[in-house]
Regions:
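Phosphate/Mg2+-binding loops and adjacent switch elements
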Residues: 1-21
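A general structural motif
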Residues: 24-35
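A structural motif corresponding to the C-terminal end of an alpha-helix
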Residues: 33-46, 74-77, 124
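Short acidic/glycine-rich loop or secondary-structure boundary segments that cap or lie
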Residues: 42, 57-60
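Beta-strand-loop-alpha "switch" segments that mediate conformational coupling across diverse proteins
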Residues: 44, 51-55, 71-101, 114
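Short, well-ordered secondary-structure micro-motifs
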Residues: 59-63, 94-95
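Charged helix-capping and loop-helix junction motifs
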Residues: 64-68
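A cross-taxonomic marker for long C-terminal extensions/tails that follow the last structured domain
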Residues: 96-106, 110-124
Length: 124
């Protein structure tokens, strides 16, 4: 029950681990076991970042860096930056027309971003 209460009020894994370590409810071995298992689970996660609607690569990199920093600090994980999707008004048009963007506008920067992402994910 104490763990459930902690989970409701704590916002980061780092905070949660600190509460477990300082809790008087658990013995030392249990504290160590819970903390090491949670850290191992967090490190096993391999989240990926794709920044959407960025104006350029520089803006996307800044956003990805900020997100990655918070993921490291609060979740103890290191996300991989896969790239970005550049903002383009024609995305809405093509969605409404029912035609794939990369077919309608293959030379647009957004189409190149989609191809780059597909390549990084192993689809090409």
């Amino acid at each position: 029950p104490e763990l459930a209460l902690l989970l409701k009020r704590i916002e980061s894994l780092r905070e949660f681990l600190e509460c477990v370590k300082t809790s008087s409810t658990f013995d030392g071995e249990t504290k160590e076991s819970v903390c090491s298992e949670l850290v191992a689970l967090a490190r096993a996660m391999k989240p990926k970042i794709v920044v959407n609607r960025a104006r350029n690569a520089y803006e996307a990199q800044i956003a990805a860096n900020i997100f990655a920093k918070h993921a490291r600090q609060n979740l103890l994980i290191e996300p991989e930056n896969l790239g970005y999707m550049v903002f383009d008004n024609r995305v809405s048009e093509t969605i409404n027309s029912g035609m794939p963007l990369v077919v309608s506008y293959p030379k647009l920067k957004i189409s190149q971003c989609i191809a780059d992402l597909a390549s990084r994910l192993g689809y090409f």
